[in-house]
């Protein structure tokens, strides 16, 4: 005979009317949850994919850093004020008066820089293992787009402290937009919110940094993982005597794969924490539009473009060359590569 609902069950039933969940219903929910997980992780994985040297854990590291940035970013929003008169002072207040405020800012800053490096190395790893060929071409485009989102997330966040270094670095970068043919001046004014870097620029960058770009990340990342799953998982390099379809013995994803991912995540989090305790995020003097530092430098991840300005006309350094590089990056998996047996064996051996 079924037991009558207890006090707490009656409260829940009053809020969510309907039949209380039976064991059969709960089993259905468990199956649904497991089905959703299978979109990103299979029940079993080839044992060879667990080798540390195959991926170096770079994809998982990138995911951990993204969520670490989202978490610390939400905490920073409670203190930061995106107006020129208070932005710099709010950072000082965060570092001096808020409990663990300096540490949280340090973690956010160094995680953002680490994410660029990790994402770039992940892109290189995919390239050198040939993991961008059929049926993974479009996933290469998605991954490249994610890397661009990471770059622009760092770029938009660079201005927010409103110190001299950030202000003039952004002034240099946005000033170069005017050399883009046709839409350069319009694009520059759109991003700056006016003819020069000022309060509207800070407001625009804050909105892009805290709302638009995180939304792109949260949409593209699951899609990226789902495409990996649909393509059959990781590419396993094979020797000349092995069939490319031979994936070897399999092991359960839980716990074999899950434990390795947890270990990588914990080591990464510990490393970021220790680094953030030892090294503070930079903060210069308050931004002064009338006093330009010498030399004025772009953020380190855009210094290559700034260096090209010394050797090429701005149109080529800021528009033509970067555009050609971007087109080449996105078109890379769609090139009709030679598929001879010798080429295939060579690629698999070097992969």
Which role fits each region the language model picked out?
Residues 13-31, 77-83, 110-133, 138-141, ...:
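Transmembrane-helix bundle segments that line or gate the permeation/cavity pathway
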Residues 29, 50-68, 95-117, 134-138, ...:
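Membrane-entry segments of alpha-helical transmembrane domains in multi-pass membrane proteins
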Residues 22-23, 37-57, 128, 195-201, ...:
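Cytosolic juxtamembrane amphipathic/interface segments immediately preceding
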Residues 342-349:
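Conserved small/polar residues in nucleotide/adenosyl-binding loops
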């Amino acid at each position: 005979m079924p037991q009558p609902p207890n006090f707490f069950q009656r409260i829940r039933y009053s809020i969510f009317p309907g039949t209380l969940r039976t064991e059969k219903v709960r089993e259905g929910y468990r199956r649904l949850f497991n089905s959703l997980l299978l979109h990103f992780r299979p029940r079993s994985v080839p044992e060879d994919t667990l080798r540390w040297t195959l991926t170096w854990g770079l994809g998982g590291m990138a995911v951990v850093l993204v969520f670490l940035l989202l978490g610390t970013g939400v905490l920073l929003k409670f203190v930061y004020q995106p107006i020129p008169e208070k932005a710099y002072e709010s950072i000082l207040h965060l570092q001096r008066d808020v409990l663990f405020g300096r540490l949280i800012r340090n973690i956010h800053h160094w995680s953002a820089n680490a994410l660029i490096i990790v994402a770039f190395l992940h892109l290189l790893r995919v390239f050198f293992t040939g993991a961008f060929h059929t049926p993974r071409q479009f996933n290469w485009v998605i991954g490249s787009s994610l890397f661009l989102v990471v770059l622009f997330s760092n770029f938009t966040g660079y201005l927010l402290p409103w110190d001299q270094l950030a202000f003039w670095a952004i002034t240099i970068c946005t000033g170069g937009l005017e050399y883009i043919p046709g839409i350069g001046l319009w694009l520059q004014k759109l991003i700056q919110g006016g003819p020069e870097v000022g309060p509207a620029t800070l407001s625009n960058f804050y909105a892009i940094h805290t709302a638009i770009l995180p939304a792109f990340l949260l949409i593209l990342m699951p899609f990226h993982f789902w495409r990996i799953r649909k393509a059959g998982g990781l590419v396993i390099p094979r020797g000349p005597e092995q069939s490319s379809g031979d994936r070897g013995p399999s092991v359960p994803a839980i716990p074999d794969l899950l434990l390795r991912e947890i270990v990588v995540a914990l080591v990464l989090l510990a490393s970021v924490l220790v680094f953030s305790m030892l090294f503070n995020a930079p903060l210069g003097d308050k931004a002064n539009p009338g006093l330009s530092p010498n030399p004025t430098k772009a953020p380190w991840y855009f210094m290559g473009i700034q260096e090209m300005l010394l050797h090429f006309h701005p149109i080529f350094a800021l528009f033509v060359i970067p555009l050609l590089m971007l087109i080449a990056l996105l078109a890379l998996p769609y090139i009709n590569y030679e598929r001879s047996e010798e080429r295939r064996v060579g690629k698999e051996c070097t992969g």
